[in-house]
From Swiss-Prot:
<keyword id="KW-0964">Secreted</keyword>
<comment type="similarity">
    <text>Belongs to the resistin/FIZZ family.</text>
</comment>
<feature type="disulfide bond">
    <location>
        <begin position="82"/>
        <end position="97"/>
    </location>
</feature>
<feature type="signal peptide">
    <location>
        <begin position="1"/>
        <end position="20"/>
    </location>
</feature>
<keyword id="KW-0732">Signal</keyword>
<dbReference type="InterPro" id="IPR009714">
    <property type="entry name" value="RELM"/>
</dbReference>
<dbReference type="GO" id="GO:0005179">
    <property type="term" value="F:hormone activity"/>
</dbReference>
<protein>
    <recommendedName>
        <fullName>Resistin</fullName>
    </recommendedName>
</protein>
<dbReference type="GO" id="GO:0005576">
    <property type="term" value="C:extracellular region"/>
</dbReference>
<keyword id="KW-0219">Diabetes mellitus</keyword>
<feature type="disulfide bond">
    <location>
        <begin position="55"/>
        <end position="108"/>
    </location>
</feature>
<keyword id="KW-0550">Obesity</keyword>
<comment type="function">
    <text>Hormone that seems to suppress insulin ability to stimulate glucose uptake into adipose cells. Potentially links obesity to diabetes.</text>
</comment>
<dbReference type="GO" id="GO:0005615">
    <property type="term" value="C:extracellular space"/>
</dbReference>
<keyword id="KW-1015">Disulfide bond</keyword>
<dbReference type="InterPro" id="IPR036262">
    <property type="entry name" value="Resistin-like_sf"/>
</dbReference>
<feature type="disulfide bond">
    <location>
        <begin position="76"/>
        <end position="93"/>
    </location>
</feature>
Length: 114
């Protein structure tokens, strides 16, 4: 019976918690949860928490669309139902089909919130 006591305790106490509970947390559980979140958040410097991604679309006629300096291309779109494109030098979208009427580049840069 001694060999079964630990597995039974595990099943009796921990498994219901893993399955979820509709009951609110008791004050001790809330305190533990709060401490875990604080410790987890302290792993990341505040500067990292305030970094975001600022994106917009640049389009042009023809098969090339360029993003401004300081930004990078994340994706491209091509006119004339062309789905074949590549990114050149991290800032230029190039549509590879013949007779492309327009090309669009999704340009993004990191932005630090104040």
């Amino acid at each position: 019976m001694k060999n079964l006591s630990f597995p039974l305790l595990f099943l009796f106490f921990l498994v219901p918690e893993l399955l979820g509970s509709s009951m609110p947390l008791c004050p001790i559980d809330e305190a533990i949860d709060k401490k875990i979140k604080q410790d987890f958040n302290s792993l990341f410097p505040n500067a990292i928490k305030n970094i975001g991604l600022n994106c917009w679309t640049v389009s042009s006629r023809g098969k090339l669309a360029s993003c401004p300096e300081g930004t990078a291309v994340l994706s491209c779109s091509c006119g004339s139902a062309c789905g074949s494109w590549d990114i050149r030098e991290e800032k230029v979208c190039h549509c590879q089909c013949a007779r492309i009427d327009w090309t669009a580049a999704r340009c993004c840069k990191l932005q630090v919130a104040s």
